[in-house]
Design a protein with these regions (language model features):
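Signature of alpha-helical transmembrane segments in polytopic membrane proteins
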Residues: 1-141, 170, 280, 476
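N-terminal hydrophobic signal-anchor/signal peptide
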Residues: 1-21, 25, 77-79, 127-293
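Residue-level signature of catalytic and energy-coupling elements of molecular machines
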Residues: 150, 211, 238, 297, ...
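Short, glycine-rich, amphipathic interfacial segments at transmembrane boundaries or analogous
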Residues: 245-247, 251-255, 314-367, 426-444
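A short, structured surface patch at a secondary-structure boundary
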Residues: 356-422, 461-469
């Protein structure tokens, strides 16, 4: 199957799935309401129901057109959470348009039907889009070969990022050498390093291959050379991943100055805005209260079971909060009463345990943990009392990993980012492997979170946390 054929089928199937899931929602809503409310069919005149269905179909066509022409969802590859944000934002706008049209037309419509219809739309469309891409991937239609220009640190990071984002559908088949230390036969994660010049592009390489230029900051000559070659030979699918390590990327605005090769990036520190902090705090209060209310029977049951092992059910361990202020981080007790003595004896007699503790402040096979403590830690239920830390304003639902005072030094320059935000019950570290992640990566993830905070990122992390907890990834 040619590239153009695969592209056509991908775009067609994605558009059909969006349209079908969009229109299907109103029929499902009508069936559910007819089943739940016996007099529903008599409440709205038949002609108004028909008009509403026609309006919904019209908006479905418009929505698919918007996804295609304005957002280019059927042609450009975008990351999952970025694409999902654009989908939900678009659907909310179309929901407002629909109710506005019905209000101005003075139709006799059911608010229940409108609410249920659009709740289903917000669920059906993203789910159908995701399922369609999975089917296209299984059929071998969604994938696109990609070649990375560069073999330095930036190219390695680009490769890891692409591998972690399956929604892009990119299959990296090679790296084009950019380093003097590269030798024939070298590879990166089993992918060969290619030594070539622009003549190589004239024969064996498909013009539809995705090229990603990811050279180092000091290799601008190499970058410009390849961009010129791609333009001359008519290669359209070319992306550049510049070296932006350490920069805040979320909500960054880009502009350029006419007739100059100067790009201006306006960076934002979202957590510095009072409106962002107010939104985050309001979300923390509402969500934590709701979770406590729902889980209160479970909290009481766990407290009872922990007390049966002797000692208090909840303990507070000192952690460093926003601005360097210490606070008692609450947890269900998962260790024996004399845990301090047990740890000291273990570290004194076991060099391997000492090395592991000095590296991560954790032990994979910790003898201090009680029988029920193993279950609580595996399921992360030992951290549920931190909901009360969130209510008190000492923590947030999402944030950097709470650390002890001794760890501040290990954060080095990144400690300033840690101190800008409240520690979180969950965060990037928790959804990126937790205890299986090395300490340097933990620090990087905490700093990345603070620099790139947004409410949408918090919501994404919360959804990913549910998946991680259910799979028990990196928990011990």
């Amino acid at each position: 199957m040619t590239f153009l054929t695969r592209n056509f089928y991908s775009s067609l199937f994605l558009a059909i799935s969006d349209f079908v899931s969009f229109t299907l929602s109103i029929y499902v809503a009508k069936i559910l309401l007819s089943f739940m409310l016996k007099e529903f069919d008599d409440y709205i005149p038949a002609q108004h129901v028909t008009a509403l269905v026609l309006l919904h179909w019209t908006l479905a066509f418009c929505c698919v057109g918007w996804f295609s022409i304005r957002l280019r969802h059927y042609y450009y590859r975008k990351t999952f959470w970025f694409e999902l944000k654009e989908i939900l934002r678009t659907l909310v706008i179309f929901a407002v348009i629909e109710i506005a049209v019905m209000a101005f037309a003075e139709w006799n419509f059911s608010r229940y039907m409108w609410i249920l219809t659009w709740l289903l739309v917000l669920i059906f469309v993203p789910c159908a889009r995701m399922m369609t891409k999975r089917v296209l991937t299984v059929l071998g239609i969604w994938q696109r070969d990609a070649i990375i220009i560069g073999t330095g640190k930036n190219a390695h990071e680009a490769y890891k990022a692409i591998q972690s984002e399956k929604n892009l559908g990119l299959n990296v088949t090679g790296f084009i050498s950019s380093e003097l230390t590269d030798k024939p036969g070298d590879s990166i994660d089993g992918i060969p390093i290619i030594f070539c010049d622009d003549l190589w592009l004239l024969t064996p390489c498909d013009k539809k291959t995705q090229f990603i230029v990811a050279v180092e900051a000091h290799q601008s000559d190499i970058r410009n050379y390849w961009l010129r070659v791609f333009m001359i030979h008519g290669y359209r699918y070319v992306s550049v991943i510049p070296t932006l390590r350490g920069m805040p990327l979320d909500s960054t605005d880009m502009s350029f100055i006419f007739s100059h090769e100067v790009m201006i990036l306006r960076v934002h520190q979202n957590l510095a805005k009072w409106s962002s902090r107010l939104l985050k705090r309001a979300f923390d209060i509402v969500a934590s209260l709701g979770i406590i209310a729902i889980l209160s029977p479970l909290l009481l049951y766990i407290s009872f079971k922990v007390r049966k092992d002797g000692g208090p059910a909840i303990y507070g361990h000192e952690r460093i909060g926003k601005g360097g202020r210490p606070f008692k981080c609450l947890k269900f007790r998962s260790m024996v009463i004399n845990s301090k003595e047990v740890l000291e004896e273990l570290l004194a007699n076991n060099p391997e345990a000492r090395a592991e503790w000095d590296e991560t402040f954790k032990l994979k096979n910790d003898p201090r943990i009680t029988r029920i403590g193993h279950l609580l830690r595996k399921t992360s239920m030992d951290e549920l009392p931190q909901l009360f830390n969130v209510l008190k304003g000492e923590m947030s639902l999402v944030g950097p990993r709470p650390i002890i005072n001794a760890e501040l030094e290990r954060y080095s320059d990144e400690v300033d980012y840690y101190l800008l935000s409240k520690p979180g019950m969950t965060g990037l570290w928790q959804v990126s492997g937790r205890s299986d992640v090395d300490y340097e990566t933990r620090v990087y993830l905490d700093a990345w979170y603070v620099k790139n905070w947004s409410m949408w990122n918090d919501i994404a992390i919360l959804f990913k946390t549910v998946s991680v907890v259910l799979r028990k990834d990196g928990a011990y």
